[in-house]
């Protein structure tokens, strides 16, 4: 383990707002993470993973993952989604309760710069 990185334990809060978990370098080798809170009807906004892999871990609520203008997947508490590099996507809260999930983004293999 590099001297600049240490084991980190973070408590997730229940506040109705975004929570940063991992900031990226120098805190990690390139991984970033946060907890997202979407109210009913809200979306995170369409964006691309670019040269990163992304993992979504859904904690509460239900929603829909839109991949570009192509596929849609139902998501919610207990679901985990892997999104490969160069994937345009958006998450929408389609339920009547808040949708909460954690995302982890890391450089794809061969791109350690992040």
What is each model feature region?
Residues 1-32, 40, 45-46, 113-114:
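A short, N-terminal "cap"/entry segment at the start of jelly-roll beta-barrel domains
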Residues 22-25, 44-50, 67, 73-74, ...:
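Short histidine-centered beta-strand/loop micro-motifs
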Residues 30-32, 52, 98-99, 108:
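A structure-centric signal for secondary-structure junctions around beta-strands
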Residues 33-37, 55, 72, 80-82:
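Conserved hydrophobic/aromatic beta-strand scaffold that supports enzyme active sites
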Residues 37-39, 106:
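Solvent-exposed residues in well-ordered beta-strands and their adjoining turns
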Residues 49, 53-77, 87:
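A short beta-strand-loop-beta hairpin characteristic of the jelly-roll/cupin
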Residues 77, 85-111:
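Ligand-binding loop in jelly-roll beta-barrel domains
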